[in-house]
């Protein structure tokens, strides 16, 4: 069994986990988001799709946040070292470099974490177990073995920056999307969940 899976195995929903905000302060319990639809992405500020995905994350949060969507971003440096800034440097990198132009995320960003390997954040260990492969590309894998910097390697590992996990209002992961699936194209799935109304979970 891959490391961190044991810690996540007993969890039934994302509400069992917490993460520290990028700006610092006390950890945020995902249980505080009960009843919301969550879109969770591992992000990086120096990736080829940073501009596209960050701006689309902002757009979804702007349009659907008032109806119950919460977008959560987790910076990760495990893929091509494309999030090599310190936590306190990431917001300035986004504002002045990429996407640049004064960009500010309107969604929740958390401290850098690992999503694969022995040091994986328990939330991502849980998400990977719940949804072992992206629904749009079940064979998605890290394409260059030289870039694998973690151990152990598992079949359900996140393959690159900007993989997405959609979580229902009961905290149960519903769908995983590959890096190639544009963030904005998840909107119909989010809309379907929002139209179901609040959960009593």
UniProtKB/Swiss-Prot annotation:
Q: Is Phosphoprotein found in the keyword set?
A: yes
Which species is the source of this protein? Pan troglodytes (Chimpanzee)
Give the EC number(s) listed in the UniProt record. Answer: 1.11.1.9, 1.11.1.12
Reaction(s) catalysed by this chain's protein: 2 glutathione + H2O2 = glutathione disulfide + 2 H2O; a hydroperoxy polyunsaturated fatty acid + 2 glutathione = a hydroxy polyunsaturated fatty acid + glutathione disulfide + H2O; tert-butyl hydroperoxide + 2 glutathione = tert-butanol + glutathione disulfide + H2O; cumene hydroperoxide + 2 glutathione = 2-phenylpropan-2-ol + glutathione disulfide + H2O
Which protein is depicted? Glutathione peroxidase 1
Which residues are recorded with the post-translational modification N6-succinyllysine? 86, 112, 146
Q: How is it modified after translation?
A: During periods of oxidative stress, Sec-47 may react with a superoxide radical, irreversibly lose hydroselenide and be converted to dehydroalanine.
List UniProt keywords, sorted A-Z: Acetylation, Cytoplasm, Lipid metabolism, Mitochondrion, Oxidoreductase, Peroxidase, Phosphoprotein, Selenocysteine
Q: What does the record list as GO biological process?
A: arachidonate metabolic process; glutathione metabolic process; hydrogen peroxide catabolic process; lipoxygenase pathway; response to hydrogen peroxide; response to selenium ion
Q: Subunit structure, per the record?
A: Homotetramer. Interacts with MIEN1.
One GO cellular component term noted in the UniProt record for this chain: cytosol
Q: Which Gene3D superfamilies match?
A: Glutaredoxin
Q: Which residues form the active site?
A: 47
Q: What is its main location?
A: cytoplasm
Q: Which residues cross the membrane?
A: none
